[in-house]
Amino acid sequence: MKNFFRKFFKTVAFLACLLVLFYLVSCIFAFKQDDGIMNMDHFYDLPKDTVDVLLLGSSHIGVNVDPSILWNQRGIAAYNCWGRMQQPWNTYYYLKECLKYQTPKLIVLDVYGMTFSGDYPSYDSLVQGTQGLRFSKDKIENILVSAPEEYRSALLLGLPASHYRYNEITKEDFQNFFWNKDTKIQSVEISGNPVQSFDIMDISGITQSEPLAEKCEIYFRKILDLCKEKDIPMLLLTSPYYLHEQEQRRFNRIGEIAEEYGYPFLNFNENYHELGLDTHKDYCDLSHMNMAGIEKYTSYLADYFVSHYQLPDRRLDDNHIWNRVVE
C-alpha cells in the first residue's frame, strides 16, 4: 500500500511539473502582438467595473482613437479591444469575453470590418482574432468559426501555433506570466510625423445599399442582439478614410440595419470636415491618422460621448485604478 501511494504521489508530482513547464513555455512563446492579443491580456488585469466605454473593431478604431485622450480630456474610462483586420465574428466573441469581466455603460463599434468579404482572413489575422482570449467555450467557438480546418488544432492548442518564435524571444517574453500585471491607461503612439495626403470622395450621391457578406451580417446582428440582450447602449461609427464606392454602399446597408435595431450610426466619411480633419495633413496612410488627426478625432468623440451618454468623470474617483496608476 505504501508503494502504491508513493507511486501515485510521484505520478501526480510529475504531471504537475509537466503542467507548470507547459504553462511557462506557453507564456514565453505565446504571440504578443499589441492588437488582439496583448490588449486582451492587459484587459484581464483590470479590476471589475474599470471600463465604462468599450471600443471594438479593426485598426480604424485601434489606431485612430486614443483612450488616454478620452481620459485626460473628459475622464472617460475607455478600453480598446481592437485587432488588425478584426473580423465580425472575432468582434462578437471578444465582446462576449469582455462582458464576462466588465459592465460598460457604452459599447462603441467601428463597423469597417462589417464591409469585409470572405469567410477566412490571413493567418496573421487568425492569430490576432483568436489568441487573445482565455481558454473557454467561447474561444473554441471563435477558432472554429474563424479558421479553416488545417489551422484549427494549432490555434486551439496555442503552443504549436507559436513555437516557431524561438528565434524572436526577447526579455519581454519573460514578463508575460500571471503575476505580471499591466493596468495602465492605453495610449496610441505613432513614431515620427508621417503624412499621407489624399482626398475622400464625395459620397453624397451614393444612396444605394449593397448587401453585406452573409457571414458578416450574421455576426453583425449577433453583436447587436447581444447588446440588446444586455441592455447596453451602443454607438456604431466609421472613421473617415480613403474608401471605395462599394464600401459606402455597404455602409448604407449598415445604416439600415442600425436603424432597424434603434442604434445610431455615425459615418464620418460624410462630414469629416466637422471634425477639423485635414486629409492632406492629419493621416499617416490612407486609413490611419497621425498624432494630429488622432487628437482631433478622439477629442470630437470625447465631447460626443459625454453629451449623448451618461458617463461619469472617473478622474474624480480616487479609487479608480487609472487614478492610482497616473499618480
Predicted features and spans:
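C-terminal regions of proteins
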Residues: 252-325
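Acidic/histidine-rich helix-loop elements
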Residues: 78-84, 208, 212, 286
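Hydrophobic membrane-insertion alpha-helices, especially the h-region
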Residues: 6-27
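Membrane-embedded segments
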Residues: 56, 60-146
